[in-house]
Amino acid sequence: MSRLFGTDGVRGIANTELTAELAYNLGRAGAYVLTEGTHKPKILVAKDTRISGDMLEAALVAGILSVGAEALCLGVVPTPAVAHLTRAYGADAGVMISASHNPVEYNGIKFFDDKGYKLSDDLEDEIQRVIESGFENVPSPTGANLGREIIEKAALEDYISFAKDTIGISLEGLRVALDCANGASHEAAVRAFRELGAEIFVINDNPDGTNINENCGSTHPEELMEYVVKKKCHMGFAFDGDADRCLAVDEQGNLVDGDFILTICAKYLKELGRLKDDTLVVTVMSNLGLMIACKNEKINTAVTKVGDRYVLEEMLAKGYSLGGEQSGHIIFLDHNSTGDGLVTALQVASIVKRTGKSLFELKNVMKVLPQVLVNAKVPNNMKNIYEEDEEIIAEIKKMEAALDGCGRVLIRPSGTEPLVRVMLEGENQAEIDEMAHNLANMIEAKCN
């Protein structure tokens, strides 16, 4: 069997790739591996608003109960709520059923350990090994030793209280627009901002099981950008389906992506003496403009591979407090152990409130270098072609020479989809747009 786990848990089209049988096996193996030797272990289970969540939850919970563990079901809550509540409730593990920003037909299963961190590759491999062994030596308890399913009704309330407590200030006087992507933030974000005193205006907060991420949320912020201006809001926030990421919109309707949010928060925290080692952790996909802004503000940058797990690894290894990605995955390690869209939105809103500056003013700390991202569709087994094909390698070198130190070419395979992402930065938008499309077309042609 090829590796089950991708960069963010197990993902696939629900009911064909990610089947109820696989969910049961993951629940059974995951509960066994993560709770070995624990007396009556407790595992949290939550989901986003996808229609397939009910089916997968039933199967996953059955697997957990089959090894004698308790399943504490939280219902629909954001992914970061699982990370936080696993710690807060003293659970042995947490599981989120979500495919994040992916379309509705996809779903995923992601595990957290007892500290609220995503699993290491070694633990994921051990879960897969147990499944492939046919559950060799895994107990099948009977009678009173079986696990029970418990519905935890206070989960959403507990998460909202935690998120609100991260800012310690009223947001009264702020007009805030929220795009909930018809996903897991549709209650948590709305209630948190309202309870903090903000006047809120909400779109895409009516999930029906099939409309999650559909032309809305952080992957499609255009509607929010217009809505913020129309409603004369001070700012807006767009979440993805499971609310582990967040993008902002300023009062003029401009998008404020993860790079801007990171730079704004890093500058503010540094001024308060709360940015550990004056260092911000980012990935290779962050805009060169962020690097320049940080240099001007005397903020160090630590650069990792793409993926919030690599950002987190660097933060934990060096004790850094802030890191994230352009996509809006922002980790405030003083608050949570994973990217948290609601916590991110609240930090930005509180900075606007405390400084008295508009979000448009705050984002002027950074100037974006034009950046183009083009997806090349490639089979999963050919994702490394850009490192192996001589013509593609030569074309990349030619483009790098043409950019002459004022830009860059970055190519990376997607961890969750049959895509290779081609990213170019440079001073001339039209030029890099053409170069990126040419390179993506070349990669696709070589694969077909």
Swiss-Prot record:
Keywords: Isomerase, Magnesium, Metal-binding, Phosphoprotein. This is Phosphoglucosamine mutase. Belongs to the phosphohexose mutase family. InterPro entries: A-D-PHexomutase_a/b/a-I (IPR005844), A-D-PHexomutase_a/b/a-I/II/III (IPR016055), A-D-PHexomutase_a/b/a-II (IPR005845), A-D-PHexomutase_a/b/a-III (IPR005846), A-D-PHexomutase_C (IPR005843), A-D-PHexomutase_C_sf (IPR036900), A-D-PHexomutase_CS (IPR016066), Alpha-D-phosphohexomutase_SF (IPR005841). Disulfide bonds: none annotated. Pfam families: PGM_PMM_I, PGM_PMM_II, PGM_PMM_III, PGM_PMM_IV. The modification Phosphoserine is found at residue 100. GO terms for molecular function: magnesium ion binding; phosphoglucosamine mutase activity; phosphomannomutase activity. It comes from the Bacteria. Activated by phosphorylation. One of its GO terms (cellular component) is cytosol. Mg(2+) binds at residues 100, 240, 242, 244. The active site is at 100 (phosphoserine intermediate). Its cofactor is Mg(2+). Binds 1 Mg(2+) ion per subunit. Signal peptide: none annotated. Its EC number is 5.4.2.10. It comes from Clostridium perfringens (strain SM101 / Type A). One of its GO terms (biological process) is peptidoglycan biosynthetic process. The gene is glmM. It is an enzyme of class 5 (isomerase). Catalyzes the conversion of glucosamine-6-phosphate to glucosamine-1-phosphate.
